[in-house]
Curated annotation (Swiss-Prot):
Organism: Yersinia enterocolitica serotype O:8 / biotype 1B (strain NCTC 13174 / 8081)
GO function terms (MF aspect): ATP binding; single-stranded DNA binding
Keyword Transmembrane helix: no
Summary of the function given for this chain in its UniProt record: The RecF protein is involved in DNA metabolism; it is required for DNA replication and normal SOS inducibility. RecF binds preferentially to single-stranded, linear DNA. It also seems to bind ATP.
Disulfide bonds: none
Name assigned to this protein: DNA replication and repair protein RecF
Length: 361
């Protein structure tokens, strides 16, 4: 799967751009603040309905413009599709697929599986459990057709339960919510556990290449004691939940814990090693998707050279090439990505929001 063409209008500092893209590596080179990351963010937004640097649509719409518009041509298994997304300052979102309106953002995410590697991506390792839940949920979303609807319903029900906790005095008054929550919670936890077990070998193998000096271990924590029945636990903890005014246990508290030599990775690894581990996790997840479904991810790498020495950059470049996936890489100079440049690559020069193809020597 590859994005063959990208049109950007009034997104960040980019007034207008129409890019014919390479199926392999696409390099975005230019000084800091030129708009390189904005191109990556436009691609990410086209596949997620939101930017990765801001959750507020108004902040990514170009100054004094009413909306941004993104459009792409997607080549998926020799079938070409068109996808489009626009967002106004009022928050109105329009999704178009193959010329028809009324589609959901989740459909874009299904069409355009992406792995994002940014300097802020360390939160996967040193941020809270929600970032590692998101890692598992990306895999469940792309591997389990019923996951998205189940998780959306569970989040809605938990929100309603938490609101009810502020008003009720007896457990019987919220039992109706729990009767709907329990089967969803158990199903989602089973999907997450199955996915973490299935991908464990891929993660271990990739991490062994990137960080052979450490013995890494991974464990899924479902969000409540594995020996406890979730329904009974919700009833037992009602008084506590009512005092807290939120549901303290469940899939929304799950985690995917990562240790190196028995120690949490954020307490042991350097920033360069953490970046390698983050890259290994993203690569392993993308390769697992390809093996399971035949679909390839898009890989988006922002500020590629930061935290990595020449040898580590070369190793990452080799592993990315081996995926045969489409890759977008931003860097300050062409020299930083010299190890990645090949016959299927394309170099773009970005300055002041203007993007031009740069001939390769």
């Amino acid at each position: 799967m590859a994005l063959t063409r990208l049109l950007i209008k009034d997104f960040r500092n980019i007034e207008s751009a129409d890019l014919a893209l390479a199926s392999g590596f696409n390099f975005l080179v230019g000084p800091n603040g030129s708009g390189k990351t904005s191109v990556l963010e436009a691609i990410y937004t086209l596949g997620h309905g939101r930017a990765f640097r801001s959750l507020q649509a108004g902040r990514v719409i170009r100054h004094e413009c009413a909306e941004f518009v993104l459009h792409g041509r997607v080549d998926a298994n020799e079938r070409e599709s068109s996808v489009g997304l626009s967002k106004s300052r009022q928050g109105d979102t329009k999704v178009r697929i193959d010329g028809t309106d009324g589609h959901k953002v989740a459909e874009l995410a299904q069409l355009l599986p992406m792995q994002l590697i940014t300097p802020e991506g360390f939160t996967l390792l040193n941020g809270g459990p929600k970032f590692r839940r998101a890692f598992l949920d990306w895999g469940c979303f792309h591997n389990e057709p019923g996951f998205f609807m189940a998780w959306s319903n569970l989040k809605r029900l938990l929100k309603q339960r938490n609101a009810a906790l502020r008003q009720v005095s007896r457990y019987t008054q919220i039992r109706a919510w729990d009767q709907e929550i329990i089967p969803l919670a158990e199903r989602i936890s089973e999907w997450r556990a199955a996915y973490s077990d299935a991908i464990a070998a891929d993660i271990s193998a990739t991490c062994a290449l990137f960080l052979p000096e450490f013995a890494l271990s991974f464990s899924f924590q479902r969000g409540w004691d594995k020996e406890s029945d979730y329904g009974e636990l919700l009833e037992r903890q009602f008084v506590r939940d009512r005092a807290l005014t939120y549901t303290a246990v469940g899939p929304h508290k799950a985690d995917f814990r990562i240790r190196a030599d028995g120690t949490p990775v954020e307490d042991l690894l350097s920033r360069g090693q953490l970046k390698l581990l983050m890259c290994a996790l993203r690569l392993a997840q993308g390769e697992f998707l390809t093996r399971q479904s035949g679909r390839r991810c898009l890989y988006l790498l922002d500020d590629f050279a930061s935290e990595l020495d020449t040898g580590r950059r070369r190793l990452l470049a080799e592993r990315l090439k081996a995926t045969q996936a489409q890759v977008f890489v931003s860097a300050v100079s062409a020299e930083q990505v010299a190890d990645m440049v090949g016959e299927k690559g394309k170099m773009f020069r970005v300055e002041h929001g203007k993007i031009e193809v740069q001939p390769q020597d």
